[in-house]
Amino acid sequence: MNDYNHYFHFPREEWRKLEVSKDQILTAEELEEIRGLNDRISLQDISEIYLPLIKLIAIQYHEAIFIHGEKMEYLKKKESRAPFIIALAGSVAVGKSTTARVFKLMLDRWFSKTRQVELVTTDGFLFPNKVLEERGIMNKKGFPESYDRDRFAKFLTDLKTNKEAVEVPLYSHFTYDVLDETRMMHNPDIVIIEGINVLQADQHESLFPSDFFDFSVYMDAAEADIKKWYLERFFMLRETAFQDKSSYFHQYTKINKKEAETFALGVWDTINGVNLKENIEKTKYRADLVLHKGTDHLISDIYLRK
């Protein structure tokens, strides 16, 4: 399937008219703190796009809690509901990380911090660089085979079986590698899982990650636009984070701009662009909701599964 026949289509102007009882729940300063590099999200986007979306997620959350309560009462069981899991997928450089941080902060505010909301990135479930190098797939980092799917499946199972403490692996974009340390999550109510691979399915597995999700979102844009944003972000990082001598990518600050551009284009054409076409984009129609961005990096259309 490669169309939106099973989705309601909301152009931005229609979506923004959806009634939301709560006022703006983020300040300009807070948005600036969580905004990703080269992301053009504004308070207007928060009001017109994200506030109605957070209300929709809250409706889904309350519905899940109600159904669970009714089921437990009927079955005469006393088991608390597992965390409500929101999956957020999409290409590199499309704005997933910023959107995930916006989701977390806005859900915290929506529920007046009466619900524990956690954010997890699937980067932590990549195999360490050492393993990728041993297997000869360092140039496939981000592809399905570069992830520890067993570890990710255990993580999701632990969440959905109400394990009291769930281990979360950590990743550093600075060192470009999985960290040795982890963090623990304790009884979250809502978990946002962000990553390029969250909606991918391995046909050899008995369970798909999507089996564990309560709501899923795909960040979409034309490939030409994503490629442009990727290059813009690369050069912004080259002038900032890459300047640190400890950065994995520091070496690319020592070459001239043309050489750096050739390198970045090569990464896109042989890795990120290929992964988008072969693996990531195919998962779009598995999502409950698709947020489509225009050339200006702003969300222009929303597609909600019927």
Curated annotation (Swiss-Prot):
GO terms for molecular function: ATP binding; pantothenate kinase activity. GO terms for biological process: coenzyme A biosynthetic process. InterPro entries: P-loop_NTPase (IPR027417), PanK (IPR004566), PRK/URK (IPR006083). It is found in: Cytoplasm. It comes from the Bacteria. Keywords: ATP-binding, Coenzyme A biosynthesis, Cytoplasm, Kinase, Nucleotide-binding, Transferase. It is an enzyme of class 2 (transferase). Its EC number is 2.7.1.33. ATP binds at G90, S91, V92, A93, V94, G95, K96, S97. It catalyses: (R)-pantothenate + ATP = (R)-4'-phosphopantothenate + ADP + H(+). One of its GO terms (cellular component) is cytoplasm. Pfam families: PRK. Pathway: Cofactor biosynthesis; coenzyme A biosynthesis; CoA from (R)-pantothenate: step 1/5. NCBIfam families: panK_bact. Belongs to the prokaryotic pantothenate kinase family. This is Pantothenate kinase. It comes from Listeria welshimeri serovar 6b (strain ATCC 35897 / DSM 20650 / CCUG 15529 / CIP 8149 / NCTC 11857 / SLCC 5334 / V8).
